[in-house]
Amino acid sequence: GLASFLGKALKAGLKIGAHLLGGAPQQ
């Protein structure tokens, strides 16, 4: 559903943002 899509988008956004900031810990 929409909530699932938003959740995935949020996680992807955080991952991309962290990568742009200099790399995030791999989880």
From Swiss-Prot:
Keyword Secreted: yes
Iron-sulfur listed as a keyword: no
Reported tissue expression: Expressed by the skin glands.
GO biological process: defense response
Locations listed in the record: Secreted
Keywords, sorted A to Z: Amphibian defense peptide, Antimicrobial, Secreted
Cellular component, GO, one term: extracellular region
Domain of life: Eukaryota
Transmembrane segments: none
Job of this protein: Antimicrobial peptide.
Similarity field: Belongs to the gastrin/cholecystokinin family.
The protein's name in its UniProt record: Caerulein precursor fragment R7
Species of the source: Xenopus ruwenzoriensis (Uganda clawed frog)
